[in-house]
């Protein structure tokens, strides 16, 4: 493994740690503020953080000796896909993150991390509706994840906690969000699209907050560190590290490293929030993580 790949892997591991521990920050934030104001405040910061990052990448791109400016037609197409994609992805992100933020109030950060990570298994399955191919290993991953979800969430009387169910809805919405991003990013500017999607999620969160919840400056200040961590580190820093690192990392290794987000979510819940899980739930976490890994294993191409 060369030095660039090693650095890339280390940065992706750091990204997984940041994203994973953000679940604990989200849970802490719910002690002081309601879900929609938390999301709105978080996405304000995320949007602001990405603006200088956009400027940085634009300047870096133009300094590249091989840089060829886009034609007026190419720029118009990219702008259209960036704006449309940002708004569409932002709407999906708003719904997904809102379900997550509401659900985490009623369950643990660790369980939220693992249930949310199911989107990795669901994305290729939902891709069937877009005529994308699904490997047999993906279906194995789906079957294993169903067993893991049962062990993690289903109680002895075959009921499921409200928080776990809401977070499961969040994982479905994140899978849809990923497919939306995949559809638009090929022809859009990915950093600008991300900034617009954060801004869209921010506006929708503020509308929902003013319409349904109580907003207080005291609550926002009390949840300040959690909001700052999720907005600046999880969104701004995490997204930037992912972009930089994936250029020098094998895609399979990259996806596996980022899957560790769920593990660090559980670790963060244990050390930061002192959360514990029953043996059955821990086994469920292990089984679900195995499903996530299996679903991402690439099959050799047929000759």
Please name every model-derived segment.
Residues 1-40, 90-91, 95, 99-102, ...:
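Glycine-/small-residue-enriched transmembrane alpha-helix faces in small-molecule transporters
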Residues 4-9, 32-40, 78-82, 139, ...:
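Juxtamembrane helix-entry segments on the extracytoplasmic side of multipass membrane proteins
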Residues 20, 24, 90, 94, ...:
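Hydrophobic/small/kink-forming positions within alpha-helical transmembrane segments
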Residues 22-23, 54-116, 151, 231-249:
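Specific transmembrane alpha-helical segments of multi-pass solute transporters/efflux pumps
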Residues 36, 46-50, 123-124, 159-213, ...:
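Transmembrane alpha-helical segments that form core, pore/gating elements
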Residues 39-41, 112-118, 181-202, 235-271:
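Helix-helix packing/entry segments at the starts of transmembrane helices
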Residues 43, 51-59, 67-69, 223-225, ...:
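C-terminal-most transmembrane helix of multi-pass membrane proteins
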Residues 50, 134-154, 174, 205, ...:
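Hydrophobic transmembrane alpha-helices of multi-pass small-molecule transport proteins
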